Amino acid sequence: GVYDAFGLLRQDKTIMAHAIYLSDEEKSLLGNKGVYLAHCAQSNANLTSGIMPLRRNLEQGLTCTIASDVAAGHTPAMNKQIALTIEISKLHALQHDTEKALTIGEGLYLATKGPGRFYGRTGSFETGYAFDALVIHMDDMEGLERTPFEKLQQFIYDGDDRNIIARYVDGELVVRG
């Protein structure tokens, strides 16, 4: 392809946004080069440019991530990008019986540890990784106790910056409240 001919597909050092209409040959090339495919669901929806076959790409071994593209999207908030990616994957799965929708866990991975590998050891709370984190507070609903996962799920679908009480980058508190 053109990108490869001009040396733009550096091994494990390239992120390609959108990647909606890739041929099998292009997928093979991008996979062999370790290119990260940045799925910008909100941007694609706003532009009505198409739906990335995310599940199929993942099953074919391509490295995919969830990203925001505020040039055509309307928020950089990653929780909203995760939610919309999952919703669109459900619609895509309805039209393609052989594909299943993304889960919350997969969406979270594709927005954290998955793309974090591009930058090194980030995107996870594992030992040896940079501590990049949001401290999130989600009020319990009246008398209803929820697990941490249920609270995270609520933040992904219903939370916003008012629920973030602290931000850490590489172990340093950068914003409180």
Predicted feature residues:
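Generic recognition of short, well-ordered alpha-helical segments
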Residues: S49-M52, A77-K80, T147
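Active-site core of metal-dependent hydrolases
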Residues: G1-A72
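A structural signal for short secondary-structure junctions
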Residues: R10, L30-N32, L58-E59, E126-A130, ...
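A generic structural signal for nonpolar/aromatic side chains embedded in well-ordered alpha-helices
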Residues: Y3, L30, I82, G128, ...
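Flexible loop residues that form catalytic
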Residues: A19-I20, K90, D139, E172
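Conserved beta-strand positions that form and line the central face of beta-propeller blades
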Residues: I15, S124, Q154
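C-terminal cap of metal-dependent C-N hydrolases
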Residues: A130-G177
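His/Asp/Glu-enriched, well-ordered alpha-helical/loop segment
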Residues: A5-L9, R55-E142
